[in-house]
């Protein structure tokens, strides 16, 4: 909330999502000195070698620098498009969630076309949070924060899912505790699935087909899905 340049990056990513017809899901990770501190931020900041805020990351493959909105949104779209072209999706996600008291329950069906070792991460996000934000050096007490990470329902490193055969369906259930100060009507669950790069067309350990490669580990995001709490998302492959 203290970061004056963060709204500009956020707007650029919203634009990128719109350009991709909603196939790009967003999550806003706040640091320890924000009003919306999230416990998992440091884990991902370390993985992606974040030196300062704001920093954008797309598909766990490449970081995006903050710039003019049109430049930044184009960079995000380019990386996401490159992921889809270079690494065709091999998983599909169907999910549902319910809130019982302060317990969030998430049921997941993971459709897997290709045997591999995957990692599944489940986060609880909140939209429409009105509060303070430094907006380009101007104090804005009515700024609307969206896609704010509230709870890591799994480890931030993801739950390991071993799939030994092609064309399998893996069923998983997760749960976590929700704070009473969070608005259930504005909550949604974000699920993303990471897959190892493998040895596809690599030269000296780097995929020769791609431009945007940050060497942030052995996996990239193969697919993701966001659904409002209390709703069901049917299988979607994209």
Predicted regions located by residue number:
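Typically the conserved alpha-helix immediately C-terminal to a functionally engaged Cys/Sec
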Residues: 4-21
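Short, conserved sequence motifs used for protein processing/export or organelle targeting and
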Residues: 15, 22-237
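Short active-site neighborhood of thiol/selenol oxidoreductases, capturing the structured segment around
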Residues: 1-4, 191
